[in-house]
Amino acid sequence: MRSLKSSLESAEDAVKNKLLQHGTGRTYAIVMETGDEVVGCLAAFARDAHLSKAEFKGLGGLREVLLGCFEIDGHPRVRVPLTEPVGVMSLVGNIAVSDGEPKVDPHAVVRQADGSAWGGRLLEGHACPSLEILLSVSD
């Protein structure tokens, strides 16, 4: 997985991102490319940008998806693995700091090629071919 850097830093291996709005609140556009793992990249971005709380939404494509459904006490009771590429119909979530580390809570609805759809907590997913996220910072 490529490392994430804040929009003020540049590195060849950084996930593409751009600060769209600055002031009381900040909004970043983040573009993940093929193979980037969503949850890990968002956590790394939050850590590198020193974010304490944020909300995000996104669209694009994923592969090697693992969704968690029917959570009780914070633990998914049903895990749905999807290995084929899927379209992201909706991706929403938030980031908060717990014990000094960013915790990403993403929820997604994805569509398979046959038209069937699945939704739940996004436990894992890799961009394919890309995933675009708008992240709004509220700290």
Label for each model-derived stretch:
Residues 2-104, 109-139:
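N-terminal intrinsically disordered, cationic/polar leader segments
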